[in-house]
A protein has these predicted regions:
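N-terminal beta-alpha lobe that positions the nucleotide/phosphoryl donor
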Residues: 1-162
Length: 163
């Protein structure tokens, strides 16, 4: 599996309607407008996180139970809240951060914005938190219960420049 599937430069991701704020910023960067330099952790990266962390298995199990999706999502979040990002995804994130060469970064998703991140462990924790958002997990449990593919979403990591 190629680690470059996990990370793209802002402006190189492609424009999907359901990419939310990340998709809008990517579109602006692709159009040549001035936006912060950044990198996008792709939907493929999110899929890898779900698979390697065990979240995918837990979401499917929760969907089969047919209980309240919000409660199930909270339980899944609690079980995986300290899961370390590992393997190929970890390497891809570390290499991308080195390439970004920013002292302070922000992680942005549809449900989360965490700034003032100064270390690789802080960034990886924010990535995990974004992919374990309660709202996102609830949507995944509901989709699995309907027999649909689990929704995934990209994350933007960009330099937090002082203006």
């Amino acid at each position: 599996m190629a680690e470059d599937e996990f990370v793209r430069r802002l402006g190189e991701v492609g424009h999907w309607q359901d990419n939310g704020r990340v998709g809008i910023l990517d579109l602006l960067a692709d159009a040549g407008l001035l936006v912060h330099e950044g990198l996008v952790l792709t939907r493929r990266a999110h899929e890898e996180f779900l698979r390697t962390s065990g979240v995918l298995r837990d979401v499917r199990t929760a969907a089969r139970r047919g209980e309240d999706a919000r409660r199930q999502a909270a339980q899944i979040r609690s079980r995986h809240a300290s899961y370390p990002v590992e393997g190929a995804l970890n390497r891809a994130i570390c290499e991308a951060l080195i390439g970004l060469n920013a002292r302070v970064v922000v992680v942005l998703s549809e449900d989360l914005e965490k700034g003032s991140l100064r270390s690789v462990p802080e960034v990886k924790d924010a990535v995990r938190d974004a992919w374990l958002s309660l709202r996102g997990l609830e949507r995944q449990v509901e989709a699995a219960a309907r027999g649909e593919d689990l929704p995934t979403w990209p994350l933007l990591v960009y330099s937090q420049a002082k203006i």
